[in-house]
Amino acid sequence: MHSNSSSGSRLCLNSLFSSLPLKALALSTMLFPFHSINAGKTLQYNTVVNTNTLTVVAVESPTTVFKEDQFLHGFGYDLARNYAQSLNVKLDFKIVADNATALRWVQQGKANFAMTTAGLSTIENKGLMSFSASCGDTVDLQKNGLNPELSWVFKQADDPLTQTASGFVCQSKQNGVTQQLASFYNRNVVKPEAWSTIQRDLTTRLPIYKASFKQSAAKYDLDWHLLAAIGYQESYLKPESVSPTGVRGLMMLTNSTARAMGVSNRSDPAQSIQGGAKYYDQMLSEYDDIPFPDRNWYALVAYNMGPGAVNQIQKRLQAQGKDPNQWVNLYNYLQSNKTRNGRYKQAVQYVTRIRAYLEHIKTAQTRINI
């Protein structure tokens, strides 16, 4: 829950410094030595405190944010969202057409900071300052196909907001959050050479089942593109698919799940899609207390592994003193234990590929004629 008082927000901002690891805090203060605050300056820190809102501006890109319909996610977005949560304030995330506009918003005070890939000279020429959004962790960004030049850009170096943000991104690097977010938003999760086959499959098969996807999505207030992405991951949109374990149909339902969802013929595409939509809706309901976009990722893992398996992991996370409702914690657990548990490895592949397929379907609709 967000604090509605300035004092509550101010406490979170101030206490962040005291909770930072010494190394991260030292780096923050080394980069931005704390000067005595000029009372005449308009500090972004004060704006955030007074409005209880952190306003961030960015240009849509594979590294910063994906925004289509109700979907809003991405490496940069999630990092900014985590920062806002650490300050106990709301995040107001704005998307503009280009880096020049994003930098201008910071200059004009329309945004507290910008996430941008603008060059350092461009930023400095506008009288702004910046630091690496990954605290210099360019290796993890590069190996996951993300732009290592992503920066957070602020109006003033001696603003407390700038200094807490610098400490936060270095703390995120130190505790592994940066690495896990980069891994989840890996642009290479689907091999580049595979996209031509995927494009051909979607062009050929998706139009056949589009009406069923849309009808079932409307019934359960879901996004039909997401259902289609699940279907492609499950069966490549082949209704006759069957696995060695007995799951069958376009949405690859087990016998017990099919019966529970009212599906009498798993090989019937319309029935399978309806059953898959109903089951996914039930998985979303399991995690009503988790905000989007994280709720989608939890529901997808539960669709793949079963909600009982997810709930067991949540209990283990809680026992470790970690927030069980933070996607980065669940994802890290799956990643860290996938070598000893094949189901965890499968779940990681499942959710990351569906995310990639979803983004592709939404941004390639005109090219694949759906």
Where are the regions a protein language model picked out?
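Ligand-binding clefts/hinges and TM-proximal coupling segments of bilobed small-molecule sensing domains
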Residues: 166-204, 317-319, 367-369
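Substrate-binding/active-site groove segments that recognize
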Residues: 240-264, 271-282, 325-331
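Short, functionally critical alpha-helical segments immediately adjacent to catalytic or ligand/cofactor-binding
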Residues: 222-238, 273-277, 299-304, 354
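Periplasmic-binding protein-like
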Residues: 58-62, 127-163, 333-336
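Catalytic and substrate-binding regions of cell-wall glycan-acting enzymes that process beta-1,4-linked
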Residues: 154, 299-364
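Extracytoplasmic small-molecule ligand-binding "clamshell" domains
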Residues: 37-118
